[in-house]
Amino acid sequence: MLLRFMLAIAALIVLAVATTDRAEAREPAYLAPPGSPARVFPPPQRPVADIVSPTRSTEQKRDAAGEFDAVARILRLKPGMTVGDIGAGSGYYAVRLSPLVGPSGLVIAQDVKRSYLAQLAARLDRSKLANVKLALGDAHDPRLPPRSLDAAILAHVYHEVAQPYGFLYNLAPALKSGAQLAIIDLDKPIGHHGTPPALLRCELAAVGYREVSFHVLPADSGYLAVFEAPDVATLPSPSTIEDCRT
């Protein structure tokens, strides 16, 4: 009887430790020291859309339109990759990237809102997706480790980035050589929660990014613009970056 009681206590301790470990692993945190501060970059002379929701539309509609499948195919995502879901929100991309990159890969789900990441943590635990790490960022700085990403995806969030030049500048060191930055957005004015492609190209070029390809996505999913980040050694000085006038 005593042995059975002791075994039960030991099992409870193991469960408590495992639960604590999972909670700590899911706790949103900055994954890198601060990069260059927002004040050294030119303020964008254009609107910045408010962050109004962690979701764009229902996930069923996005799946029916084939959004994720099209993006994954174009980017040639595969097992073993480390992919950043920047502005992860409710985790539409994160939960689909997780099985795609597999146990040998990693998804870093980053957002500036701790509350969104807390909700995503609960979703990940329910779905038992162990290869997703949560990362807290700032509006001008994603705060991600150097050379950690094979690809980074910003899905329907670029128009909400308050300091695009600082954000892109501080993101570049996190991308491995040859890594892709994929931006998905609607071809609409910023105020209507989209980014005109010409404006997007101008802002990324101002920080040294090179456009690789441009694709119109199925249904109303918008467009996918793929860029290659500049080498850190060739990044322009923040004081020389010129704002793209709208």
Q: What residue spans do the PLM features occupy?
A:
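Class I SAM-dependent transferase core
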Residues: 26-84
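Short glycine-centered segments of the SAM/dcSAM-binding site in methyltransferase folds
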Residues: 82, 106, 178-181
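Class I SAM-dependent methyltransferase SAM/SAH-binding core
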Residues: 84, 88-142
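A short glycine-rich, Lys/Arg-flanked "PGG" loop and its adjoining helix->strand segment in the class I
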Residues: 98-99, 165-180
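A short acidic, Gly/Pro-enriched loop at the edge of an enzyme's catalytic core
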Residues: 140-152
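A short SAM/SAH-binding and catalytic strip from SAM-dependent methyltransferases
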Residues: 150-164
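Conserved class I S-adenosyl-L-methionine
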Residues: 180-203
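Core SAM-dependent methyltransferase catalytic element
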Residues: 216-246
